[in-house]
């Protein structure tokens, strides 16, 4: 049930021809194709703009791309950021007993 069969497609084509007419159907398909091309071009330009802005922000902040992987036998470079300080566990000076 739910599988699309060839006769389903044939019925769909007949309904489309009846609704839009044989003369308007190619024009509708052409305008739909143009719209899809425009949407594709706009989303690509938005994606490229986002990438350009990210690269510009990284350049302004002084970030550099990650260095290539360290080869065997070489020491890795130290991170330019200091390691976070080690936190010591908090000890409660007052301990409760069950008798109190």
Curated annotation (Swiss-Prot):
BP GO annotations: protein transport by the Tat complex
Pfam families (UniProt xref): TatA_B_E
Protein's cellular compartments: Cell membrane
Main location: membrane
Family: Belongs to the TatA/E family.
Signal sequence interval, chain numbering: none
Highest rank taxon of the organism: Bacteria
Subunit structure: The Tat system comprises two distinct complexes: a TatABC complex, containing multiple copies of TatA, TatB and TatC subunits, and a separate TatA complex, containing only TatA subunits. Substrates initially bind to the TatABC complex, which probably triggers association of the separate TatA complex to form the active translocon.
GO cellular component assignments: TAT protein transport complex
Membrane topology annotation: Single-pass membrane protein
The name this protein goes by in its record: Sec-independent protein translocase protein TatA
Regions crossing the membrane: 1-21
Coiled coil: none
Gene Ontology molecular-function annotations: protein transmembrane transporter activity
The UniProt record lists the keyword Cell membrane: yes
